[in-house]
């Protein structure tokens, strides 16, 4: 399916040297993403970083982090470069800016430009969280011809506004990362069974429609947070349900591997807006508003990435 791309939402040194290459070589994935939580998990729990950390002892914590993280990003970039050279819409790896800068546009812009210049790779995307300062940051990076991944997008309204900016100003590839499964984790305990495991897909589909109103060949919806939070769902539930044209799904390894055992042969037709509106109306009878939930999940997501980054830095 040329219209749909699968990326890997995982990064870790041993993985990059082994299974990551296998996934690329067999055509299973054509991109990858990282975030502060993934780096925290990898660096604090994997033995493959310990010798390097020991050699960096005495340096500032953020300097140690960047030395380790940028090495991984460069390795992923090199592995994905043949895909990028064949088709500049594919073959990207994402690196997120310091999550503690999310409310400071100027510092966010400076850090993003510094990281992109340091890495000096055309297939690196700089990740920017969809905080209040994001619009200024996105605009500046787009004008600087930096590939962008706008992350922690929960609201269809925000998704559309971001797409509008990128449609006007993006000179390089850009994706808008719409988070999915966290909606179901939040809402399912509050609704009857017939409404469960649907909120994430409904909201993500509405985001997809909003983005596509402005999307061009440089801009795509990227569905993220697509690992299931419930044992009752198939591991690849969110990949299969959101297999839309001109979209990307970045998935954790368990979801990715499950999907590859039985992949879709063609893209899904998205739910109609009328179906989404009917579902939202049904949710409101249970005092649930998806836009309010989106705002709550964004705040929690920003906090979670800060906590992971702080935990990682303190481990040094």
Curated annotation (Swiss-Prot):
PROSITE patterns in the record: TRANSALDOLASE_1
Catalyzed reactions per annotation: D-sedoheptulose 7-phosphate + D-glyceraldehyde 3-phosphate = D-erythrose 4-phosphate + beta-D-fructose 6-phosphate
Subcellular localization(s) per the UniProt record: Cytoplasm
EC number(s) given by UniProt: 2.2.1.2
Keywords recorded for this protein, A-Z: Cytoplasm, Pentose shunt, Schiff base, Transferase
The keyword Chaperone appears for this protein: no
Pathway involvement of the protein, from the record: Carbohydrate degradation; pentose phosphate pathway; D-glyceraldehyde 3-phosphate and beta-D-fructose 6-phosphate from D-ribose 5-phosphate and D-xylulose 5-phosphate (non-oxidative stage): step 2/3
Signal peptide annotation: none
InterPro entries membership: Aldolase_TIM, TAL/FSA, Transaldolase_2, Transaldolase_AS
Disulfide bond entries: none
GO MF term list: transaldolase activity
A cellular component annotation (GO) from this entry: cytoplasm
Gene Ontology biological-process annotations: carbohydrate metabolic process; pentose-phosphate shunt
Active site feature: 127 (schiff-base intermediate with substrate)
Organism superkingdom: Bacteria
Role this protein plays: Transaldolase is important for the balance of metabolites in the pentose-phosphate pathway.
Record family assignment: Belongs to the transaldolase family. Type 2 subfamily.
Protein name as annotated: Transaldolase
UniProt lineage: Bacteria, Pseudomonadati, Campylobacterota, Epsilonproteobacteria, Campylobacterales
